[in-house]
């Protein structure tokens, strides 16, 4: 439900050319299917092997530093505020730190198969097992492959990498809601998930109080402070808080900014059969067919006499 990245343990990655540290923020906050990891790499380090997921989409967001996004043998410069989308079954990819080091959030949409291809290791992850099954783990094979060959950075970046300031902000203003939304994931071509950079005005709400029937969401507070309204409870939040909202909890949520405003990343899966309920107004949104209506909540036995 709620965690703070200062309280989540770091795991050191030390496998030959794979170096860095990782936090499993999504699991710490109670995510069910979706994933969120934070990778911190010193200058020149690479914490993850070159890989591509069979059915899982990833969105990276650079918190601090600079480096290179390696994609299918090409390299692209990335820096703080960049969003990088890796669609399922697309190019093999990894990310490397530059001279300043690199701090990256990696969101993942969840997998039904657990299949991941590591081309340099010439191996597959198959959930907790791997192929070839009679050899070392894919991580060991990746380490044995040695340092990743790095070409010179390309002069232009692909459409799957966008800088937050280059994405237009869409205002959301009505009643107590006053916020600006930058749809970073959509701008970078995400299909199975979405990510927004949300700036909430001081004292205002980010969006109406709501809960999801099918989509899972993860929020990361990047700056400012405020309050998380969760059902009948309220919890203070500030920079570094991570909030996971699995689907079908029946518990609505809302962010309310404090005096300094609130900036957060709002990531979520995309489901065509999504249903959203707004308790404050008793509305239901059938997103797949674009129909909204007001409902009266009843007891199971109402009208059954």
What are these regions, as identified by a protein language model?
Residues 1-33, 43, 116-192, 202, ...:
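A short, N-terminal "cap"/entry segment at the start of jelly-roll beta-barrel domains
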Residues 18-22, 37-53, 177-183, 196-212, ...:
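Conserved short histidine dyad/triad with adjacent acidic residue
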Residues 38-42, 52-71, 109, 197-201, ...:
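Short, conserved beta-strand element in jelly-roll/cupin
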Residues 74, 88-114, 247-274:
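Ligand-binding loop in jelly-roll beta-barrel domains
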Residues 73-90, 232-248:
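Short acidic-glycine-tyrosine-enriched beta hairpin
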């Amino acid at each position: 439900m709620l965690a703070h990245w200062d309280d989540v343990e770091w795991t050191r990655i030390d496998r030959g050319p794979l170096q860095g540290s990782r936090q499993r923020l999504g699991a710490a906050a109670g995510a069910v299917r979706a994933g969120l990891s934070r990778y911190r790499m010193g200058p020149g380090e690479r914490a993850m092997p070159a890989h591509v997921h069979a059915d899982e989409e990833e969105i990276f967001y650079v918190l601090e530093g600079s480096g290179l996004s390696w994609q299918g043998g090409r390299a692209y410069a990335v820096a703080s505020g960049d969003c990088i989308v890796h669609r399922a079954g697309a190019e093999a990819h990894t990310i490397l730190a530059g001279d300043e080091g690199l701090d990256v959030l990696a969101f993942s949409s969840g997998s039904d198969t657990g299949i991941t291809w590591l081309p340099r290791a010439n191996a597959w992850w198959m959930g907790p097992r791997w192929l070839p099954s009679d050899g070392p783990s894919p991580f060991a094979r990746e380490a044995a492959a040695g340092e990743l060959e790095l070409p010179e950075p390309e002069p232009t970046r692909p459409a799957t990498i966008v800088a937050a300031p280059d994405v237009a902000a869409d205002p959301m203003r009505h009643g107590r809601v006053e916020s600006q939304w930058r749809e970073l994931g959509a701008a970078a071509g995400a299909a199975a998930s979405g990510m927004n950079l949300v700036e909430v005005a001081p004292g205002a709400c980010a969006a109406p109080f709501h809960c999801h029937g099918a989509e899972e969401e993860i929020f990361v507070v990047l700056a400012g402070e405020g309050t998380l309204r969760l059902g009948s409870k309220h919890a203070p939040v500030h920079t570094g808080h991570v909030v996971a909202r699995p689907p079908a909890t029946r518990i609505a949520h809302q962010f309310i900014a404090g005096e300094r405003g609130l900036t957060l990343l709002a990531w979520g899966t995309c489901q065509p059969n999504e249903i959203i309920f707004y308790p404050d107004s008793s509305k239901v949104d059938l997103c797949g067919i674009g129909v909204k209506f007001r409902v009266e909540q009843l007891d199971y036995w109402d009208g059954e006499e």
